[in-house]
Regions:
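Nudix hydrolase/Nudix homology domain
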Residues: 27, 65, 71, 104-113, ...
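Residues that flank catalytic or metal-binding motifs in active/ligand-binding sites
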Residues: 8, 37-39, 71, 102, ...
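Acidic, metal-coordinating catalytic segment for phosphate/diphosphate chemistry
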Residues: 2-40, 44-48
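The catalytic Nudix box helix
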Residues: 52-53, 70-103
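A glycine-rich, hydrophobic loop/mini-helix early in the fold
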Residues: 38-74
Length: 202
């Protein structure tokens, strides 16, 4: 499944997020990397504000077994980011019907020292609340483990030892922390999406 996903198409972008072309997942993540559109989802428990983290499966071609946000992926060229995020969340964790809020964009480049593969992403950060009565059911081909953490505990974890975490997690968490500290800001592009066909993840 991971190998097949390398052939999926991603949206190449410039530093402002404007589309400039297309490439396969495999080509976009081959050194030195090509900047492309991605998303990072945080799923929140509305009862206590905790956030769901996932440990990436061992078969991932980039940063396997690192802890990351709830799920990540790439929209298809021209596809709405929230639509792709809703599909990916359902694929990896069995959670559908989530309303997303865009909380920021994190652009970063990171090379996996073990595989030489590169993440170079214009990463839309999304926040959604876990629907009432729903329990995540991780796909073991995508997710090794999950855990719920508070935002403060996650930030403390970065300070204590950043090694177990994916290289993008600090940046996307900083976007989320800034958003949550400013609840008066507008929340554009929120939407509700259910789960259809499979899409490209990362």
């Amino acid at each position: 499944m991971t190998i097949a996903r390398e052939a999926h198409i991603v949206d190449l972008v410039d530093q402002s997020g404007a589309s400039v072309g297309e490439a396969t997942v495999g080509a976009a993540h081959t050194a030195p990397g090509r900047l492309h559109r991605a998303f990072s989802v945080f799923l929140r428990d509305p009862a206590n504000g905790s956030l769901l983290l996932q440990q990436r499966a061992a078969v991932k071609t980039r940063f396997p077994l690192r802890w990351a946000n709830t799920c990540c992926g790439h929209p298809l060229p021209g596809e709405d980011v929230e639509v792709a995020a809703g599909r990916r969340l359902a694929e990896e964790l069995g959670v559908a019907g989530v309303a997303f809020t865009r909380v920021g964009v994190h652009t970063y480049r990171a090379e996996d020292p073990a595989t030489g593969r590169v993440e170079y992403e214009y990463d839309h950060v999304l926040l959604g609340d876990l629907p009432a009565g729903v329990q995540p059911v991780p796909d073991p081909a995508e997710v090794a483990e999950t855990r719920w953490v508070s935002l403060s505990a996650l930030l403390d974890g970065f300070s204590a030892d950043p090694e177990p975490y994916s290289p993008w997690l600090f940046g996307v968490t900083a976007c989320l922390a800034e958003h949550l500290a400013q609840p008066h800001l507008p929340r554009p592009n929120a939407g509700r999406f259910d789960a259809p066909e499979r899409s490209g993840g990362r």
